[in-house]
Amino acid sequence: MTVRVRIAPSPTGNLHIGTARTAVFNWLFARHHRGKFILRVEDTDLERSRPEYTENIQAGLQWLGLNWDEGPFFQTQRLNYYRQAIQTLLDRGLAYRCYCTPEELEKMREEQKARNLAPRYDNRHRYLTPEQQAQFEQAGRKAVIRFIIDDDQEIIWQDLIREKVIWKGSDLGGDMVIARTSENGEENFGQPLYNLAVVVDDIDMEITHVIRGEDHIANTAKQILLYEALGAKVPEFAHSPLILNQEGRKLSKRDGVTSIDDFRKLGFLPQALVNYMTLLGWTPPDSTEEIFTLEAAAEVFSLERVNKAGAKFDWTKLDWINSQYLHRLTGEELVPLLLPYWQEAGYNFAAETDRAWLIGLATLIGPSLTRLSDAVAESRLLLTPLANYNQEALSQLQLEGVKDIIKDILAAITPDLTGEVAKGIVETTTKAHRVKKGLVMKSLRAALMGELHGPDLMQSWLLLNQKGWDISRLQQAVNS
């Protein structure tokens, strides 16, 4: 048997971290079993679905490295398949037309609430006669198609994560709406609803394993009944834990950063984000190993090691993982990743003309980066011809003899300064002024950087020298 799994997002918003984590688990499972990973776009919600969201979802999956083998398939292009399935269920007496109005359904819910009962449809139109149906249609009522769910049946499956799961038919809310008739009343059933469309797609696409969030468990019970009613083999199911916020509630848009776009803009690398998402609910065989590629994770991935409990989102852990990936990159590799952040902040560096200097800058700040978006903050002392002196630096420059030290250093500077020459200037100045080297270095840092703390001073000096900014800054210090 070839393993076939799918990720089936709805294009009603940008790619969400929860959907992306589900995609990661499906991708890993497919690759581990040398199977197929299928992309299906569930776009039957015509009011909320947008083509730009479809593009965002596909771009997000590609950015994360989650390449799919088949698709994308769109549900709006498969309506005839759903209508055929609905007709089959009607012909078999497993579904029926329900003509209840919204007002009648609301009154039903209110009465149930008053009696402290869970809201459910009471199946009142399950056994309408043809004459009764005709009367409703003559009155202009629009029908929905309901699938019959017997209250006294049990739905049982062996979940690959949660083990044995049992649902009672009586807990599923009564006979389930699977489609609405069209506005003009034609017998084309209008728009099929989620549970019916999903089952038909999974049957046609020969999906062997459905891996999704635990919030779909009730849907799974309903869908198993539909598989059986359509005479199809029921796939294996695995329900992964939800991603939780710091308060232990399901992560939602109210928590702020939830879309993959958000994480990308914040400066997270796709490899790091995928690495972290893999650990959100899954424990690798070697629990001490936390940094790995998708391909390495696929070799050892199994659903048995997915946790049942919710996975709390940990920003500190994500930042640490991201920093590990960043610290492995060379300056040359960092430049194209950091350049957009410098440019967005108003620094007009060019990838070609400033390339060598930017590589040196990226090499200098690379070990300090946690996110790509840290680029400006970590390099801010080196980005302009003049320094912005804080009070601590100004106080250092006002000490007796310091400006004379700066003048001597300024006089000794040459273009294309090397590390050895720079060290020699410091040594010569220290001896000439008969002071401790620490005073010279501290004063030089104050003059060049505008602050007494920051990146490596000698490397910073060489970078500033390449643009002639060491001279302009030392002159600024002398005149301060």
Curated annotation (Swiss-Prot):
Swiss-Prot/TrEMBL GO biological process terms: glutamyl-tRNA aminoacylation
Protein name as annotated: Glutamate--tRNA ligase
Matches recorded under Gene3D superfamilies: 1.10.10.350, Glutamate-tRNA synthetase, class I, anticodon-binding domain 1, Glutamyl-trna Synthetase, Domain 2, Glutamyl-tRNA Synthetase, Domain 3, HUPs
Swiss-Prot/TrEMBL catalytic activity: tRNA(Glu) + L-glutamate + ATP = L-glutamyl-tRNA(Glu) + AMP + diphosphate
Family: Belongs to the class-I aminoacyl-tRNA synthetase family. Glutamate--tRNA ligase type 1 subfamily.
Main function: Catalyzes the attachment of glutamate to tRNA(Glu) in a two-step reaction: glutamate is first activated by ATP to form Glu-AMP and then transferred to the acceptor end of tRNA(Glu).
Chain location of the short sequence motif 'KMSKS' region per the record: 250-254
Originating species: Microcystis aeruginosa (strain NIES-843 / IAM M-2473)
SUPFAM superfamilies xrefs: An anticodon-binding domain of class I aminoacyl-tRNA synthetases, Nucleotidylyl transferase
Record's keyword terms, sorted: Aminoacyl-tRNA synthetase, ATP-binding, Cytoplasm, Ligase, Nucleotide-binding, Protein biosynthesis
Subunit-structure text: Monomer.
CDD domains reported for this sequence: GluRS_core
Gene Ontology MF terms in the entry: ATP binding; glutamate-tRNA ligase activity; tRNA binding; zinc ion binding
Name of the coding gene: gltX
Enzyme class, UniProt record, top EC level: ligase
GO cellular component, one term: cytosol
EC identifiers of the protein: 6.1.1.17
Residues bound to ATP: K253
'HIGH' region, short sequence motif: residues: 9-19
Localization (cell): Cytoplasm
HAMAP family, per database record: Glu_tRNA_synth_type1
Regions that span the bilayer: none
